[in-house]
């Protein structure tokens, strides 16, 4: 009977790092027993030095990281500062800080570190063994202190933070000089999708909601996002809305959006003549049959009640 070898996996740079359970547990016990010489020898014999050091990075065990890299003469900045990038990827703050203090290139791999850190969720979960969580804001601040934003596309960093729903990171980036004006419509659309508070913050910082011919208002209306009132208050021009934008809001039963437009004086008469633009023969045939036989109010009620317009269109 063959014993199945369970394996601990963790991934980085599309490379799977693994330690078979018996090796993994053996190495850990040697570490616990402070039998460092034997540990280093066994890791070398099994060609697992890099793998075990990587594991220490993942769990942010700085003391043993320093000890093992020193005893095994491991160069800590090899492979484009791989351990540093791994530390950032796993939010291993202590090791990331140590590596920066000892010469890690904060801009390595096209500013990987600050881009990665800006895109973390509210909390990034460590390796399951430690069952630990830490807010990632401190890591972002650390990287900024080491000039990670210098020479970087900071507008893209803000966009990354918005996509991660991180108002706190957006604020830190902006407070440290991040650009929010070179691609305003992109940032606004992302904020519309992910976080009303971020949208409100960007507006408070002077971002122009009319950028790109009010494209963010068209985006919000046509996809049913409940921030139209905020955009209008900030100066968005609803007269730029197309017939298609409003019709999509109607089909999605966006009653709040339609009500907001109505309260702000939007002229829904632009929808008159919409039937003349329909080129689908099946739709035209139905309209012709129903015309003068069924009230348009009832036709609209039937269509809206039975509308299966993609509720997941907002993505």
UniProtKB/Swiss-Prot annotation:
<feature type="repeat" description="ANK 5">
    <location>
        <begin position="212"/>
        <end position="240"/>
    </location>
</feature>
<dbReference type="InterPro" id="IPR036770">
    <property type="entry name" value="Ankyrin_rpt-contain_sf"/>
</dbReference>
<feature type="repeat" description="ANK 1">
    <location>
        <begin position="79"/>
        <end position="108"/>
    </location>
</feature>
<protein>
    <recommendedName>
        <fullName>Putative ankyrin repeat protein R600</fullName>
    </recommendedName>
</protein>
<dbReference type="InterPro" id="IPR002110">
    <property type="entry name" value="Ankyrin_rpt"/>
</dbReference>
<feature type="repeat" description="ANK 3">
    <location>
        <begin position="153"/>
        <end position="182"/>
    </location>
</feature>
<dbReference type="Pfam" id="PF12796">
    <property type="entry name" value="Ank_2"/>
</dbReference>
<keyword id="KW-0677">Repeat</keyword>
<feature type="repeat" description="ANK 2">
    <location>
        <begin position="118"/>
        <end position="152"/>
    </location>
</feature>
<feature type="repeat" description="ANK 4">
    <location>
        <begin position="184"/>
        <end position="211"/>
    </location>
</feature>
<keyword id="KW-0040">ANK repeat</keyword>
């Amino acid at each position: 009977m063959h014993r199945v070898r369970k394996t601990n996996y963790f991934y980085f740079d599309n490379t799977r790092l693994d330690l078979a359970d018996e090796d993994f547990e053996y190495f850990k016990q040697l570490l616990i027993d402070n039998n460092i010489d034997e540990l280093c020898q066994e890791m070398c014999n099994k060609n697992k030095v890099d793998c075990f050091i990587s594991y220490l990075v993942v769990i942010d065990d700085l003391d043993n990281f320093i000890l093992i890299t020193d005893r095994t003469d491991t160069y800590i900045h090899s492979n484009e500062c791989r351990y540093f990038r791994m530390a950032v990827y796993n939010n291993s703050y202590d090791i990331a800080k140590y590596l920066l203090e000892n010469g890690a290139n904060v801009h390595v791999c096209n500013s990987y570190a600050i881009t990665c850190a800006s895109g973390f969720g509210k909390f990034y979960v460590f390796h399951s063994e430690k069952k630990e969580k830490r807010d990632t804001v401190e890591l972002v601040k650390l990287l900024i202190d080491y000039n990670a934003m210098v020479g970087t596309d900071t507008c893209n960093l803000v966009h990354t933070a918005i996509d991660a729903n991180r108002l706190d990171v957006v604020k830190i980036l902006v407070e440290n000089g991040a650009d929010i004006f070179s691609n305003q419509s992109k940032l606004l659309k992302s904020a519309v999708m992910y976080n009303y508070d971020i949208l409100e913050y960007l507006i408070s910082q002077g971002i122009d909601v009319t950028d790109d011919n009010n494209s963010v208002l068209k985006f919000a209306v046509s996809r049913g996002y409940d921030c139209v009132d905020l955009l209008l208050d900030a100066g968005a021009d609803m007269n730029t809305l197309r017939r298609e934008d409003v019709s999509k809001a109607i089909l999605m039963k966006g009653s709040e959006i339609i009500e907001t437009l109505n309260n702000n004086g939007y002229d829904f008469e632009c929808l008159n003549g919409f039937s003349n633009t329909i080129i689908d023969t099946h739709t035209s045939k139905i309209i012709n049959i129903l015309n003068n036989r069924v009230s348009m109010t009832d036709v609209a009620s039937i269509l809206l009640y039975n509308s299966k317009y993609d509720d997941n269109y907002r993505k």
